[in-house]
Amino acid sequence: MDRERKEKRNNRFTTKMQKKLVVLYLCVLLAFTGLGARLILINRDNGEQYEKQVLSQQQYSSRTIPYKRGEITDRKGTKLAVSEKVYNVVLDCKLMNEKEEYVDATISALTQCFDVDEGEIRSYNEANPDSQYYVLARQLTYDEIAPFQELEADEETGRYIQGVWFEEEYKRNYPLGSLASDVIGFTSSDNVGSYGLEEYYNDELSGTNGREYGYMNDDSNLERTTKAAVDGNNLVSTLDVNIQSIVEDKLQEFNDTYKDAVREGNGARNVGCVIMEVDSGEVLAMASYPNFDLNDPRNTDALIGQNMVDADGTVLEEVINEAALSSMDDDTLYRQLNYLWRNYCISNTYEPGSTIKPFTAAAGLESGALSGNETYECAGSLTVVAGEKPIKCHNVYGDGVLTISQAIERSCNVALMKMGQTIGETTLLKYLEDFNFGLKTNIDLAGEARTASLVFTEDTMGPTELATTTFGQGFNVTMIQMITGFCALINGGYYYEPHMVSQITSSDGSVVRNIEPRLLKQVVSEETSAKIRDYCLQVVIGENGTGHTARPAGYLIGGKTGTAETQPRGNNEYVVSFMGYAPADDPEIAIYVVVDRPNAENQDDAKFATRIVRSILTEVLPYLDIFMTEELSEEEQQELEEAQIAYEQALVSGNDVSGNDADENTEGSSEETGTGTDGGAEGSGTDGTGPESEGESSADSGTTDGSSDADGTDSSSETPADNGGYTMDDITIDPETGEGVLPDGTRVDPDTGEVIGNVELNLPESNLPLGEEDEGDSPF
């Protein structure tokens, strides 16, 4: 009975449970049915959105694929700037820590193959065990990472080396080091160009980074999606590395000769040279000294010997040495580096001196103000404004009656001032502007100086300013303005825009753009241009020419010397220059050399520049297949050999080999306040060095007495031309022959100082006998 009751109770419980289970099952079924319906609705309405979200959550890895910055080559394909693939060593601590045996094996391999500290790795790993990106070494070459990759590939050791991978990037490299450093520029750590072509063409050289994504797909397989990098374009520059090398070698030789000669520091504050094709505006070479290593632009060794620059951008007399360098704060150091990196040939401004005289003559001839048959009498000075001091010529006794050609040949200031009075302010300013003085040339380089406020206008030019402008004082120019205008002056009058790049190509070598010579205007006629060429030829070969020492043996060239006294007047500091072309009968190239304050006792000597020109052209002209047209006489051969011996002796002794001939010396500088020299930044007036290197200085002065070379006295005392600038006191007597001997070895008559023997110095005549004081100014 009890048993029957128990069975009935169990049966009732089982039935009850079955009913509950059925109800529960139905509820669950209903819930899943509702959930399924909801999912269907969600997928229908928002499926694509949620799919993207899920995929983004499933992303497994991502890395940047760096682009390759474009190359820069010279006109013949020699590589000047390239980008080389390098590798960063990256440690994934989280992966390395997955197994204990991985840690020691991986760290051991790293220290064995790379210059890394084991203690630092372990300390970092302990502090950051989940880190997945720890850079151990940067910018290694493939050869440097190869030993580690071999260890990884080894079956026995490789399985324990985990968590190390190599991040690819590109490193900018300059195969020729410091060659053309001012022109090329360099890149910063973020691959952005600074200075030169690197900055100007940064957008062309830059590419676009690519990306590689990895994620797990629906089948739990790793999927990868890659967006390729787009490499930058390449530049074919107009430079010729062979010509560039010749130029830089000669500038270096000049510095080696005059470094620390009279004062501590480089051979000059700056020395610049530009060589340009006359009929295209293409720059074959552009260099200045000092330069720097493009692969290590922040190496402070290059600053030794450079003048200090203050916070206002003014260049000081103080020279950087080891002691000064060690005491500089970061701001001061960066300021000095910025001055080093700027391109003197386009960023610095200065008064041109007598190199402007051919432009003055051209303005008169082309405008019709001058016929070319005029003559001018030079009595040694000219009173421009009644009651004011006269502006003196280099020869205070006067040059006599001169034609235009003779005035250019002798570099007579008085004759040029009289031409200016005939030409007039409006016409002269018009032609100077036509030659782009006061305007940018728009050369394709970063940092070209603005000079709009560094030249006179009709509002600021009076009679004195007109007079001094005719011979190159009171206004400022850049080297690129001068040589570009000079090319137009002697090529038939055709003004081409100067440029540094002739072609842009893609990474696969296809041509993106050809940059053809751009003819902007004709500034003078063929007839006027031919006359100017004749005038400039006489400067070099004429009996009284000031540029004899620029002529390379066997060639005829034309050109013009220049010497300009810097601000403040009377400081005996000068910018000397020579601007020329070759060959004389059919110009192919123009060359312009500027020496800014040579490190010598007597700076006012154009031969500091002409000798550089001669040494450069002696090598460049044969390289360009421009052949000699003049036979070398025995006398000329002897002169060349003796000049070479004298120069080599000077290199050994450190003596001044400038010669200081009056006829190539200071070319009458006026006392007007003018614009100063080397203005670059924010109107500093002296070597401006603002961050953009494109500042302007004021040109609204130049209104004092206008006398030349400060007060016009003792500017070239006892430095007659015939004897290299030496005086009677410099003569010693050879006891064997009784002849007089000058410090440079030249033999002279001990009583008169006249050169004896067969050696001719090819110098113009002096109006003064040796030992007699010349109180005037030397010609530009």
Language-model features: where?
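Short, mixed-charge low-complexity intrinsically disordered segments
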Residues: 636, 640-650
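Disulfide-bonded cysteine-rich modules in secreted/extracellular proteins
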Residues: 725-734
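Short coil/loop linkers at secondary-structure junctions
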Residues: 115-117, 370-371, 438, 627, ...
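Beta-lactam-recognizing serine transpeptidase/beta-lactamase-like catalytic domain environment
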Residues: 2, 81, 87, 216-228, ...
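Periplasmic/cell-envelope proteins involved in peptidoglycan metabolism and beta-lactam response
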Residues: 1-320, 349, 426-432, 569, ...
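Substrate-binding beta-hairpin/strand module that engages nucleic acids
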Residues: 383-386, 631-634, 639
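Short small-residue beta-strand/loop micro-motif enriched in glycine and branched aliphatics
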Residues: 513-514, 599-603
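Short, surface-exposed charged micro-motifs
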Residues: 578-580, 730, 745
